[in-house]
Amino acid sequence: MTVTLTANYKEVFKQETVDFIEENCIDGEYDLDDALKFIDEHSEEDFVTFYDAYISAGENIGYDVVDAFIEYHGDVSYVEHVEDAYRGVYSSAADFTEEFYNDVYGEVPSFLVVDWEATWQSSLRYDFDFVDGYVFSSSF
């Protein structure tokens, strides 16, 4: 159910949700339109339970990152793990793989030719998720 008028939320939502909105959006620092959008995309229960974590993670690592992680996992409850799981943004899984192995084992000598995409496929894809350019650890 889409809440089209911000004034009617008191008539539509449960008292617990209204109280959360009053405390955090009206008297607090959260934007009411953003909060209502979150409820539309998820649920009232998820709003009350996870919105603080969503805002915190979004401010720390970016809302696009958080939204991609939630969408990939299919449940907003995963928002509690996104900051621990996030490894960065990369143009490809191969770029992440190259950086990962260089960080762990040191620079690969320039005379060696490494197929980083094949290395991703055979090794790292089991431990990491590549989602819309974002890399997340799958062990969180």
What are these regions (language model features)?
Residues 1-140:
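Acidic interaction surfaces
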